[in-house]
Amino acid sequence: MFRAQQNAFDDAVAKATDENLTSENWEYILDVCDKVAAEESGAKDAVAAMIKRLAHRNANVQLYTLELANALAQNCGPKIHRELASRSFTDALLRLANDRNTHQQVKSKILERMHDWTRMFSSNPDFGIMEQAYMKLKTQNPNLQPPSKPVKKEITQADRQKEEEELQMALALSIREKSDAGPAPQAESSAPASAPVSQTQAAAPQAVPSGTSAATVSRVRALFDFQPSEPGELQFRKGDIIAVLESVYKDWWKGSLRGQTGIFPLNYVEKLPDPTVEELQREAQMEADVFGQIKNVEKLLTLLSTRSSELNVQDNEEITALYHSTLAIRPKLIELIGKYSQKKDEFTQLNEKFIKARRDYESLLEASMSHPPQPQYARPGQPPYGYPAPTGPHGYPQGAPQPDPQRYFSPRPQDQTHMYPPTSQSPDPRGRTPPAGPTMQQQQQQPPAESFQPMHHRPESTYDNPQELGTSVYDSPVEYPPANQRFQYPPGASAPPGVHQQLQQQQQEYSPSNYSPEDTTNPPTANFPPQPQQSQLPYPTGPAGHQAPPSHQPPPVPGGASKPSPYPSLTPGAPSAGEYQAYNPSQASASSNPASFYR
């Protein structure tokens, strides 16, 4: 006759906290928030609907209900705050948290949300019921709330030394146990009463003393859920077994879990001793029992698939016996699946790291093979054209330092060709008169600056002797040397003014530092064929672009019976009839015939 009034929020709350959801559906949650804000009694009806959902036995429904309540508290203002801080809702939370059948994760979430709501309602003293309920739950269940994360402090040298000492002690204890394990069977057979003592001694190393470093611990078990708040931290849930790798900070270790590596706080885990021999034997026996039931499982499956549906299974003793025998291995099978699933994840992660390392190594190896280091072989740098070369201590042009002849390839002298930079084309210098005497004296006192550098070593030639150079009013026609000794100039260019001295200075046997300025009139002529000594006059100083004086002797006067060779004689001694004598303007009159100087 009298039925409870239907709550308008039951369907909306049930939809937002459905047990079949895989995660929070924020579309449904926001629909509930909008409906609460739109109706006058929306806050009261929504909290009543959530209390019903908290009584559900499904842990997912309980977790979704807590998330819905938190969303309402953040979006619906003081009306929903008052209903959440009511006695009915807080009692429902305490009742669920104190129930032993409630999932541990649900209990932790209740404590977390009550803590958030206490801080949210702290400004209004009328909502103090939530704070009282939170303190009561925290006192009754101290293990629900995870501890605060320790501060990351660098490990000091003393901590490192202590860790090393503990490692050495653990190694010594392990060696002692292995040495004592040898005569154990003989002692057990001769004195059975000593067995309890041996078992006590074997169980003693399982106790982990306080302050143990990561060097002596290989595994830890998580006591609380840990959510990383900074990069590099390891996420885990309560009950996970973490493999310890090393100590990073004073209260933080580095570990590996399900293929992930990161640091974790020590107050969130408990230390686990290494498995003993008995534990390893127990695990091996469990695996043997599981694999021993494979035939029975296959036989049971065959019997059930071949029998007709009308068969009474209860009357068939064989099927019943096989079913009960295989049913006992299911918990062991689930445990082994979890164990080897974790190992598979670890091995898969290790394989991925190895593949990445191998690819990086191969790429670096290919890069180093495709771009080998090039030897730094090059000739010494030459000064650029147009700039004077560095001079020595006595004012002479100083050439580049002589490199090691074994490090560079040098062509044979007869195959070398002298290349000169382009210069401006100069007119035929015949008919020009030398400039005044002071200019010539100044040019003689100061050697011309080097304005170019030949590219190769100049072969030995009689034209290199500066004593063969002369100047006259009439310049004889130029006779070119053989092709293998010809000095090549670019088209439309002539030799720079200082070419003859520069060619002389390029000889390997000649070094400007071997003689002083007093020896300028007689430079060393070693390794040159002896030539007749002739008077030498200074070079004329002309405008830029004038052709340099010839560096060879002119041919004899035409009209002879036989045509003489255009090349100078290499025979030492008296000059021949066709040799050339320099013309001296100071000793000849203006009307003198230049031809009289040919002998």
From Swiss-Prot:
UniProt record, GO biological process: protein transport to vacuole involved in ubiquitin-dependent protein catabolic process via the multivesicular body sorting pathway
Region feature (Disordered): 140-163, 177-212, 368-599
Domain of life: Eukaryota
Subcellular location: Endosome membrane
Topology of the protein relative to the lipid bilayer: Peripheral membrane protein
Keywords: Endosome, Membrane, Protein transport, SH3 domain, Transport
Pfam families attached to this UniProt entry: GAT, SH3_1, VHS
Residue ranges, compositional bias (Low complexity): 181-210, 438-454, 533-550, 580-599
Domain UIM: 162-181
Entry GO terms, CC: endosome membrane; ESCRT-0 complex
Domain named SH3: residues: 215-274
Pro residues bias spans: 381-391
Domain VHS: 16-145
Biased segments, Polar residues type: 413-427, 462-474, 509-525
Signal peptide residues on this chain, from the entry's feature table: none
GO molecular function annotation: phosphatidylinositol binding; ubiquitin binding
Biased composition (Basic and acidic residues): 151-163
The family this protein is said to belong to: Belongs to the STAM family.
Subunit-structure text: Component of the ESCRT-0 complex composed of HSE1 and VPS27.
Primary role: Component of the ESCRT-0 complex which is the sorting receptor for ubiquitinated cargo proteins at the multivesicular body (MVB).
Protein name, UniProt field: Class E vacuolar protein-sorting machinery protein hse1
Source lineage: Eukaryota, Fungi, Dikarya, Ascomycota, Pezizomycotina
Gene: hse1
